[in-house]
UniProtKB/Swiss-Prot annotation:
Disulfide bonds join C4-C20, C8-C22, C13-C27. Probably participates in a plant defense mechanism. Has strong cytotoxic activity against HUVEC cells (LC(50)= 0.58 uM) and various cancer cells including HeLa (LC(50)= 0.48 uM), MCF-7 and K562. Also displays some hemolytic activity. Binds to and induces leakage in phospholipd membranes, particularly ones containing 1-palmitoyl-2-oleophosphatidylethanolamine (POPE). Signal peptide: none annotated. The presence of a 'disulfide through disulfide knot' structurally defines this protein as a knottin. This is Cyclotide hyen-D. It comes from the Eukaryota. InterPro entries: Cyclotide, Cyclotide_bracelet_CS, Cyclotide_sf. Detected in stems (at protein level). The keyword Disulfide bond applies. This is a cyclic peptide. It comes from Pigea enneasperma. Belongs to the cyclotide family. Bracelet subfamily.
Length: 30
């Protein structure tokens, strides 16, 4: 639920390495 400061409209979340996932075109963690 916390934004990771990264969008994932055209590319995947690089922050996935620290547990972030793409939700509504923005990367979130929990």
């Amino acid at each position: 639920g916390f934004p990771c400061g990264e969008s994932c409209v055209y590319i995947p979340c690089f922050t996935a390495a620290i547990g972030c996932s793409c939700k509504s075109k923005v990367c979130y963690k929990n």
